A protein has these predicted regions:
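N-terminal leader/targeting and assembly helices and adjacent pre-domain segments
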Residues: 1-139, 228
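Acidic, glycine-rich two-metal-ion catalytic cores of nucleic acid-processing enzymes
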Residues: 140, 144-228
Length: 228
C-alpha cells in the first residue's frame, strides 16, 4: 500500500542516517587506550538519543495511518469519513504504547553492533574491517525495513479500524485475509470467521495486526477486520 511504502522509506532512511552517525562515532573512538569491551560501549550511539529520533520519525506516521484507516472503515460502512477522529479513542493510547515499544528496533541493532564489534576487536581487526562489520549490521537492518513497515502499518491501521468500529457501534467483525499464497496457514483458517468485537479470535488476536497479539500472528500480517 502507499502508506506501507511511505513507512518503509522513512524507516530505511532512518537506518541510513543512523549508520552514518554510528560509523562517525566508531571512527572517532578507535585508538583510545581502554579495555576492548569498554571501548565498544563508548563507541556505540547513545540509545536514549536514538530512541527519541526514532519516535519523531514514526509518531506522525502512526497518526497519518490511523486517520486514513479510520476514514476508510467509515466509507465501508457508508458513513461520512470526516466524522472519524482518533482523539479520545482507545486507539490513541494504544498507539502511544506502540511508540514506547518501537524502540525495540534500536535495541536489537545496538546489541548486534556490540556483539560484532567486540568480536572484531578481539581479533585485532583494522578500522576498515570494524567499519565493515557496522555496515553489515545496517545492511541487515535495511533488509528488514519492509517487514518492519508492514508490521507497523498494519498495527496502526488495525487499531484505528477498531476505534472506528467502536465509534460506529459495530458489534461483530470478520477476519479477511489478503487472499494470496503468502497468507500464513493460521490466518487462512481464520478467513471469514466472525466474532464479537473485543473478543479474541482463536489465534489470540482481537483483530488482525493486533499489537497485543502473539508476535508470530502479527509480524508481516496483511489481514483486516471487516465490520458486520
Amino acid at each position: 500500500t502507499p502508506l506501507e511504502k511511505l513507512v518503509q522509506r522513512k524507516i530505511s532512511r532512518y537506518f541510513f542516517e543512523q549508520r552514518k552517525r554510528q560509523l562517525r562515532k566508531l571512527e572517532e573512538g578507535l585508538g583510545k587506550t581502554v579495555t576492548r569491551e569498554l571501548a565498544v560501549e563508548t563507541m556505540l550511539l547513545d540509545l536514549e538519543e536514538e530512541n527519541i529520533l526514532l519516535k519523531k520519525v514514526v509518531w506522525p506516521l502512526y497518526l497519518e495511518i490511523g486517520q486514513e484507516a479510520g476514514k476508510s472503515l467509515l466509507v465501508e460502512l457508508g458513513a461520512d469519513p470526516e466524522i472519524f477522529t482518533l482523539v479520545d479513542t482507545p486507539a490513541i493510547a494504544a498507539l502511544e504504547d506502540k511508540l514506547i515499544k518501537v524502540v525495540g528496533i534500536n535495541e536489537t541493532v545496538r546489541e548486534q553492533l556490540r556483539d560484532t564489534l567486540i568480536e572484531g576487536m578481539g581479533q585485532m581487526e583494522t578500522t576498515a574491517e570494524l567499519m565493515e562489520r557496522v555496515k553489515q549490521v545496517y545492511n541487515f537492518a535495511q533488509s528488514r525495513s519492509l517487514t518492519i513497515a508492514r508490521t507497523e502499518t498494519g498495527q496502526a491501521a488495525g487499531l484505528a479500524r477498531d476505534a472506528a468500529m467502536g465509534q460506529m457501534q459495530v458489534v461483530k467483525h470478520r477476519w479477511v485475509t489478503a487472499g494470496d499464497e503468502h497468507v500464513r496457514v493460521s490466518h487462512q483458517e481464520l478467513n471469514g470467521m466472525v466474532v464479537e468485537r473485543g473478543q479474541l479470535f482463536p489465534n489470540g488476536c482481537r483483530f488482525p495486526c493486533d499489537p497485543g497479539g502473539p508476535a508470530g500472528e502479527v509480524i508481516n500480517c496483511r489481514c483486516v477486520a471487516a465490520p458486520l
